[in-house]
Amino acid sequence: MQRNTILHKTLARALSMKRPHNSEGTRRLTDWLALNAPAHAKMHRDEVGNLHIDARQSEANRTLFVAHVDTVHRDEGPNKISKTTTHWRADGAPLGADDGAGCAMLMHLLHAGVPAYYLFTQGEECGGIGAKYVSDDTAFLLQFDRAIAFDRRGIDSVITHQGYGRTASDAFAEALSEALNADDTLWYLPDDTGVYTDTAEFIDVIPECTNISVGYYNEHSDQESLDIVHFTALAERVARIDWDSLPTLRDPSVKENKWDAYDDWYLGGGREATSVTSFARGHWLVDDRSEEHTSELQSQSTISYAVFCLKKK
């Protein structure tokens, strides 16, 4: 990755700071993002500190890109980064690629001239504080057909479900996967094993809400790393996608439980079930290894971090 690009500058800036919610780190990064946005973009901050950057060129531009500026760090200060030609890591702390990598990807898309609306949210790690605030504005969300986050571990997921519910159609995820894989350097597939990111807050209004693997592993732990080779290849690809040409099929008024398709398959004697496709397609070969490695660390920290977030609100 070239050092003087906005992609590299944003990533290095974000990862160099510990950024717990409502901290000096989140304020400094948000200020930096605003200062380094393209001059022509319309920009404002809302009441909870989310940074909105509108780079749409017409009403036909109906894509919302989302990344969050906060991390799971509990203290503030510098974050010492170790770099190799293939991976970045932090010394004794989470790297913060969740979601510093997403912030860098959005800035890259902005400067590449991709016409869309860009939203940098506050407090995702504390329950989606910024996204929940935005979700109350139905008129705003009705402007979009798709909400895209770059906040998923691994290197191959286009998320169709978060928690137990569907957030994006299979047709959308398949089309986006094909677009990401177009030059044969990436290998993305629809994945129904998503957990949570900001786009989950928009599913009652926006039809296609997804999360794309951005190359980090072992998030929320001091073993977190970022596959910089994959991250760079992804950045090169996403700037060439025609996002507004992607299909829009999911009906936000129809709530689909993750296991509905499996029940149909089981009761119907073997009809196709989208809920088991992630296992069949191989995502678990990546995700299980990551989750297994960090599950103990994450389970130990979940309750105490929730208390920390309450204190920071």
Description of each model-found segment:
Residues 7-60:
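A non-catalytic alpha/beta surface segment that caps or lines the substrate-entry region
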Residues 44, 59-115:
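Active-site metal-coordination/substrate-binding segment of hydrolases
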Residues 296-313:
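Positively charged, low-complexity/disordered segments
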Residues 146, 160-285:
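Active-site-adjacent substrate-binding region
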Residues 289-292:
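Short, compositionally biased segments
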Residues 95, 99-170, 191, 199:
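Acidic/histidine-rich catalytic neighborhood of metal-dependent amide-processing enzymes
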Residues 38-46, 80-87, 182-190:
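Short secondary-structure junctions
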